[in-house]
Regions:
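Feature marking well-ordered beta-strand scaffolds used for ligand recognition
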Residues: 1-168
Length: 168
């Protein structure tokens, strides 16, 4: 029950309904299993950067389960991911990263400062945006999709994103 596949460098981070699986994809035709991190049953998008993986667990859907949270994993040692912190959420879906922030689709759009992963700080919360997926293009552009359509934002000032375009 795979939910997402996030390629990062020579690895694949695979979010499933029961956990995150990490594969070495140095040989593209033969990915090699490295490890997994099990979590409560739920839908599971995952994104990562150098040493951290960010996992949203969304319950109450076809994925079953009733947990709604954001997990942050230490993946310095890809063979042994460690849970650093869990944050309760309302109903998290997609998420995207920049070097300094997390853009999280949960009860609208939440923008979190991630400088200290053990103590995330909410920078902004836009409850009027009913979005379910997020993609960042560098540290400048955020793409969102949801009930209202497809959005493009300038995020050079993360606390004050500026809508550039919207397709309904």
């Amino acid at each position: 029950n795979i939910e997402t596949i996030f390629p990062y460098k020579n690895h694949l981070f695979i979010g499933s309904q029961t956990g995150v699986f990490i594969y070495d994809a140095s040989q593209e035709e033969r990915p090699v299993f490295k490890s997994n991190f099990s979590h409560a049953t739920g839908c599971d998008p995952v994104v990562c950067d150098d040493d951290l993986a960010f996992v949203t667990i969304h319950g109450g859907t076809t994925c079953r389960g009733n947990i709604n949270q954001l997990d942050i994993l230490d993946v310095k040692n890809l063979s042994s991911p460690i849970l650093l912190q869990s944050y309760p959420m309302k109903s998290p879906n997609g998420l995207a990263l920049t070097e300094t922030h997390i853009y999280l689709c949960d009860d609208g759009l939440k923008i979190l400062d991630r400088k200290d992963p053990a103590n995330l700080k909410m920078v902004a919360h836009f409850q009027d945006l009913k979005v379910t997926d997020a993609i960042t293009l560098g540290d400048k552009i955020l793409l969102l999709i949801g009930e209202g359509g497809f959005y493009q934002f300038d995020i050079t000032d993360p606390a004050n994103p500026k809508e550039l375009s919207k397709i309904v």
